[in-house]
């Protein structure tokens, strides 16, 4: 994930910061407890495509 791109992207729901999860290829918003997938190097910033974080993921 390009650091410049990550710096300008925000959660489409709450406009909060996103963290890059390299292992899962996701952009994570801990505020909303959502993880947005990265497919073929492109972040999919659609709420309906996001998965809900587990309790452990939210706390960790």
UniProtKB/Swiss-Prot annotation:
It comes from the Bacteria. Disulfide bonds: none annotated. One of its GO terms (cellular component) is cytosol. Pfam families: Trm112p (PF03966). InterPro entries: Trm112-like. Belongs to the UPF0434 family. HAMAP family: UPF0434 (MF_01187). This is UPF0434 protein HCH_02705. It comes from Hahella chejuensis (strain KCTC 2396).
């Amino acid at each position: 994930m390009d650091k410049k791109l990550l710096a300008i992207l925000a959660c489409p729901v709450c406009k909060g910061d996103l963290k890059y999860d390299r292992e899962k290829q996701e952009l994570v918003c801990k505020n909303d407890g959502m993880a947005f997938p990265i497919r073929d190097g492109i972040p999919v910033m659609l709420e309906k495509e996001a998965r809900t974080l587990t309790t452990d993921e939210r706390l960790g």
